[in-house]
Structure formats: structure tokens, C-alpha cells
């Protein structure tokens, strides 16, 4: 797939070379994004409260328990009225679960569809997709929203594909998106803590930056004096990024030096891109790939080719303030699927 990302109208508020990012999110953009997350409607405490009402023994807060004991002189007794009702709804979902079956539009492809159905059944079983969907549905019923990740497994010993539930606290998304699948949303962020040793093992090329950041080891001995350039350029930029980042985001929000952990920000965002498409049917178009012999053959036989403007999904990975990866993808949707129950009109 070849797509030319259109340059942004501005660099998201970049004020220096440290901030700039060619066709991607800068550090300033990440800061603005995180601040935008804080400015969203305050629905998360209500969702946490709804989950607490479902859990056993969490119907009364510590303050209410103390008040009942002291003012009423009785021992508080909690009766969970919603637990059984929700379990009944979840049981109906489990009973109605069925295998995914692929059906061909034409009889001549029936054998192919049978083989694909078998492969789909295997993938569903090995990736525990049914359990992940049930967990996402359960979170949707209890608190209004659930998330499921569909991606490739990073461990070569695991099944190639993984379908796993993701806690709602880890996901932040574009609140302005109207579609239930978020295909009109500009961005989605997943925030999660990672242990330093695992992060370094997966990305050894960033060992020095990650260890210095978690250990807060930007000592004066390792940093250049004014007017000196003895420090490596990458480390110097990392130190400057961390110093600037800490002005707006508290350090304890993304770094745990005691536990040796650092928070990763997995940013998926859409940018305008110009592509060349090949018309393969009245209603179907594909991005033209000049390295694909089938596409080249189709064009030589007279297939129509035209330019179009689309949205390209990029993925940017930050470890705290340190941008590690910013790459384009061929995805048409984010790898995180939302399970919405009701959405507030806000």
C-alpha cells in the first residue's frame, strides 16, 4: 500500500526542533491530547460506581458505613439487588453464543467458504475470542462501555492472533466521534504501565533512555554544560523532552521509580492522505500497489485508476514524554473495538 500523508497545517504547536515530528504527533501534540482527555465529560466515576454496585460488598462507602454505625446504632447490612439481574443478562448472552460461519455469495465458492469457516473457528477458539467478547459485553452492561483488542500476538510461542478484553480505564478516545465503531474519530489512546525490564527486553535500542528516565538518572555529570555538546544528541533531546513534559504532566503520573515502571501511551490517530486507487468493481476500490503483480496486470488490462483523499491511521508510541515509534499503518480501523451500551448526549 502506498499512501502519501498530507503535511499538517501546523506542527501541533511545535516550538522547537525537539517538538517537531515529520507527518506525526509531536510532544506538544501529546500534551494537548492528554489535556483534552481531562476536559472530557466526567463519566468515568459514574461507570466505576456502577461496577461497584455490581460487585459484592461494595454497595456502601466507608463514610456511609461509619454513619450508620454511629448515628443509627446498627450494624450495616448490604443487599446486592443488581448482581442477580445482571448475571441473568450475561447468562442469556452466553446461551445465545454461536460459531462464526462464512458463507459464499456464489455456489462455486462454497468449498472456499467452508475452509475459511474452519480457520475462523480455530482462530476463535485459540484466541479465546468468545471469552473476550463476553468480558467486553459484561463491562458494557455493568458500566456502560467495554473494550476488546484484536491484534497480532507479540510472543512467537502464542497463537498468532489475540483477542483480549481491555479495562476501560486504559482507553481514552475522541469524544467527538459519532459512529459506534469510532471510524470517524481522529484518535484513540491506550495508557498502560510496563515494567522496565520487560520494556528494555522488547526495545533494547531505547535501553539508555528508558533506564535513565525511570531511575531519574539525568545527573549533572552526564549532562552537558551550557554551550557544550558532549552528550549524545538522542539523550540530550530525551532529557529536554522530559524536562518540558514535567511542566504540564506530573512525573508520578507516568513514572514509578520505586516499582521500576513507566507508563506507555499508545496513540492511534488518523491523518489525511493522498492515495491512488484501482477500481475493481462498481462499488469496490483498492489502494493501488505497484509491487503487486495482480494490480499491475489489472491496470494493463484497462482497469480504471484514480487519485483520492482518504485517512491514514498512524501509530505513535510514547514512554512518558519519550517518543519511541511513529509509523504509518495499513489499517482501516483502530485495533480496539468499543462495546457501547448507552452514550450520554453531551
Label for each model-derived stretch:
Residues 1-311, 322-330:
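Extended, helix-rich architectural segments
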Residues 337-346:
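Short, intrinsically disordered, charge-balanced linker/junction segments flanking boundaries
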Amino acid at each position: 500500500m502506498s499512501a502519501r500523508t498530507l503535511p499538517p497545517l501546523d506542527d501541533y504547536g511545535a516550538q522547537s526542533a525537539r517538538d517537531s515530528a515529520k507527518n506525526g504527533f509531536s510532544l506538544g501534540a501529546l500534551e494537548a491530547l492528554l489535556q483534552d482527555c481531562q476536559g472530557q465529560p466526567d463519566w468515568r466515576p459514574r461507570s466505576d460506581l456502577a461496577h461497584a454496585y455490581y460487585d459484592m460488598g461494595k454497595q456502601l462507602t466507608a463514610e456511609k458505613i461509619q454513619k450508620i454505625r454511629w448515628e443509627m446504632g446498627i450494624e450495616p447490612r448490604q443487599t446486592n439487588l443488581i448482581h442477580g439481574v445482571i448475571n441473568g443478562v450475561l447468562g442469556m448472552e452466553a446461551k445465545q453464543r454461536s460459531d462464526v460461519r462464512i458463507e459464499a455469495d456464489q455456489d462455486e465458492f462454497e468449498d472456499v467458504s467452508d475452509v475459511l469457516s474452519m480457520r475462523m473457528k480455530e482462530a476463535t477458539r485459540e484466541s479465546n475470542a468468545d471469552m473476550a467478547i463476553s468480558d467486553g459485553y459484561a463491562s458494557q452492561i455493568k458500566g456502560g462501555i467495554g473494550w476488546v483488542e484484536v491484534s497480532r500476538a507479540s510472543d512467537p510461542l502464542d497463537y498468532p492472533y489475540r483477542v483480549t478484553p481491555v479495562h476501560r480505564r486504559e482507553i481514552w478516545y475522541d469524544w467527538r466521534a459519532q459512529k459506534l465503531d469510532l471510524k470517524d474519530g481522529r484518535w484513540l489512546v491506550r495508557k498502560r504501565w510496563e515494567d522496565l525490564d520487560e520494556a528494555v527486553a522488547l526495545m533494547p535500542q531505547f535501553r539508555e533512555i528508558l533506564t535513565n528516565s525511570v531511575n531519574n538518572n539525568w545527573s549533572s555529570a552526564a549532562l552537558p554544560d551550557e554551550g557544550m555538546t558532549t552528550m549524545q544528541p538522542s539523550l540530550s533531546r530525551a532529557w529536554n523532552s522530559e524536562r518540558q513534559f514535567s511542566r504540564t504532566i506530573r512525573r508520578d503520573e507516568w513514572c514509578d521509580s520505586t516499582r521500576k515502571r513507566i507508563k506507555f501511551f499508545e496513540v492511534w490517530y488518523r491523518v489525511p492522505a493522498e492515495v491512488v486507487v484501482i477500481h475493481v468493481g462498481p462499488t469496490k476500490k483498492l489502494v493501488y500497489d505497484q509491487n503487486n503483480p495482480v494490480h499491475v496486470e489489472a491496470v494493463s488490462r484497462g482497469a480504471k485508476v484514480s487519485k483520492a483523499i482518504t485517512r491514514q491511521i498512524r501509530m505513535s508510541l510514547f514512554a512518558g514524554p519519550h517518543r519511541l515509534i511513529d509509523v504509518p499503518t495499513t489499517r482501516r480501523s483502530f485495533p480496539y473495538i468499543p462495546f457501547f451500551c448507552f452514550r450520554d448526549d453531551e
